[in-house]
Amino acid sequence: RTEQNIIVWMDHRAIAQAERINATKHRVLDFVGGIISPEMQTPKLLWLKQHMPTTWANAGYLFDLPDFLTWRATQDATRSLCSTVCKWTYLGHEQRWDKSYFQQIGLEDVLEHDAAKIGSDVKMMGEPLGHGLTQRAASEMGLIAGTAVSVSIIDAHAGTLGTLGATGVSGEVADFNRRV
């Protein structure tokens, strides 16, 4: 089904697009370590636009997985500051997308309608979303409609948070403030 066309994180079809973006030396790249990886979203979006124009033209929203999951659960299209900064080039410290970057790389159309396709509402991880689980999502998961759902976090960051409470091999628990 075309509406479920998924490009996973490790997909490297966008190497040429990443190289083209890196050649711009745009200031946005300073916030992703100086170069963009083909595993990040803007090269993938550019690849999609160039190689699957019908899919591109028909795309409603473009999501990273954690934001898709929260949207699917709540129908709230709010994006995570974590995923948008880490993988989409959102300037979190300025709370905005850089229009000149998207224009320079040929993706200015994703900023139409207040960037609704990629995230016009970006919030901190853990903030509540919408009215919680929709009836449909709640039924599918065996939960109660309205159960709270929060803004997402990418897996690597969630894994780090999950290990902070773990004890070492010795069983000794370090002071939490020293582990953070």
Predicted segments, located by residue:
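E2/UBC-UEV (E2-variant) core
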Residues: 17-21
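Catalytic phosphate/nucleotide-handling subdomain of diverse soluble enzymes
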Residues: 139, 147, 151-180
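Gly/Ser/Thr-rich active-site cleft segment
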Residues: 1, 6, 10-12, 23-154
